[in-house]
Amino acid sequence: MREIISLNEGWTLRFPKGERAAETVTLPHTWNAVDGMDGNGSYLRTTGVYSRTFKKPVQPLTGGRVYVEVLAAALDATVKVNGTVATTHEGGFSIFRADITDLCRDGDNELTIEVSNEDTPSMYPASADFTFYGGLYRGVNLISVPNAHFDLDYYGGPGIMVTPKPTADGG
């Protein structure tokens, strides 16, 4: 049975370059809530590190997989579990997931998501007439599923897709 656990509460956000003091935040969150709205274009473009602990979900059936689901992280993200990189993602507007089963341990686990809204040559657009908000501006979930489950690895999709293939006779 699929279980979705919200991880939106209890995050610590720190800035490795020291631009701001560490703070406790609830998702969704952006560090540009104020400076991104002042109209002068000089908002903070940096890397923020979100971290929190979680307990590995127990699947009622034997086996099972655990995924972390990030609903949006602007603009580059690196997800780590217990210090090991689980996945990276470029592009701040889409859902992404990572199977973290083998990185989890019984008891407390540390989830860290490094997010950057810095100007990156590999990311389009590099500049625009809007603010490139930095942060986890949608939620983060754990998804626990049994071994037999719909695909959760395909581009953050819902796990099932139907594609009609019309034929010449209209069928």
What are these regions (language model features)?
Residues 3-5, 12-17, 40-41, 45-159:
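Accessory beta-strand-rich segments of carbohydrate-active enzymes
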Residues 164-171:
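Contiguous beta-strand segments within globular domains
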Residues 32-40:
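N-terminal glycine-rich cofactor-binding segment
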Residues 11, 18-32:
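Extracellular glycan-recognition surfaces and repeat-rich motifs
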Residues 2-3, 23, 32, 68:
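Residue-level marker of intrinsically disordered, low-complexity segments enriched
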